[in-house]
Amino acid sequence: MNALMLDLPLVLCLTSVGFYLFCIFSAVCHFSKRKESGKETEFLPPISILKSVCGADAKVYDDLASFCRQDYPLVQLLLGFQDARDPVIPVIRRLMLDFPEMDIRMVLCGRKMGINPKISNLIQVEGQAKHPFLLICDSDIRVGRDYLRRVIWPLRRREVGAVTCMCHALSKGMIGTLEALWESTEFCPHVLAASRLEGIRFGLGSTIVVKREALERIGGLSSIADYLADDYFLGNRIVQAGYRVVLSDVVVEHGLSIRSFGELVLRQIRWNRGIRVCRPWGYRGLLLTYGIPAGLLFLILSGGTLTGWIVFGATASARLAMAYVVGARFLNDRSARSFLWAVPLLDLMSFVLWAFSLVGNTVYWRGRTFKLTREGKLSPILPEGAVSIEVKEPYETASAVTR
């Protein structure tokens, strides 16, 4: 019985070490041979950038301005919001003044077109898009000047329907650092491993560039308007429609606004349950990747023997090596470089939240509680309070204002 109790955590340690090494291998293969960026090519088609925005913080201008400074010939920037008094509006107006040569439009999205407010906005924004290539990304993303040239390049191929990107987070404080560490040292390595094993069959919210014809083939954005993991399902349905989704070697930045540990926990539970619905067997298989908890359990059950310490030390070393190579070296995440020591603590917390999220189907999102269906759709649990939005000139529902 004692041998059996030791065998299970030992097997989990071995599978985890194998997984960590495979993640390192996947990262080296993905980044070491930089893909053709298209910077010297003729493939520079017109592109419309679609963003759903809400509120304004100190970084929002710089985030949006990075899309206006692109080394790219023809770009349209469409920014959708739901409230005619949204504080982001003066920021957009400043953007219009600072970049008069840029086609920037703000769109008041007064209609509710699905449970997911981001997709509801994007559906209405898309109606103003002029170009055959659409770029959808979260509002807190910041990019380099060559971003568009590089992410558009794979779409020159007929079989490619979309391109997506990983990101690293710009964090402040310990709570934000934990979230940033999770993204760069746990989530992104899993993305790289999945890409190497089966190809990318999903999208990432940091960037999804899609051919309009591919989007129309899956029924448009309205087909994912009630889903929590809208980015996942957008990419997945494009694959199901017969296209390929390519993971770019571009890594973008995004800001974090986590304010408390409780908010971090609720966010992680939402992520976990969303992943469990999207990839149920893959989510269960994550048990084989939690080397730190397994190594610690083996150390305790072995009574602190030399063998126990060797197994734990080897497992932890492999985990830290993977975190550094993927997070610090390739994703250039400052949190992974400065707080590498916190990765074991993160893994223990992540394992507890993973186990907790194996059951249950409720998620807390944007101030409301939802039931998550088996299909990944959101179903409100708490009634939504009636909100009256007064629309004033120069705004019209789902209409664009340029300058």
Predicted feature descriptions by range:
Residues 1-65:
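N-proximal low-complexity "stem/linker" segments adjacent to membrane-targeting elements
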Residues 3-7, 11-18, 25-28, 286-364:
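Membrane-embedded multi-pass helical conduit in multi-pass membrane proteins
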Residues 45-48, 76, 233:
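Cell-envelope/extracellular polymer assembly enzymes that use nucleotide-activated donors
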Residues 65-74:
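Short, acidic, metal-binding catalytic loop of nucleotide-sugar glycosyltransferases
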Residues 74-84, 105-110:
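Short beta-strand/loop segment that forms part of the nucleotide-sugar
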Residues 94-127, 131, 146, 150-222, ...:
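Long helical/loop segments within the catalytic core of UDP-sugar-dependent glycosyltransferases
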Residues 131-142:
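Short beta-strand-to-loop acidic/aromatic patch adjacent to the donor-nucleotide binding site
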Residues 227-233:
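Acidic donor-binding loop at a coil-to-helix junction in glycosyltransferase catalytic cores
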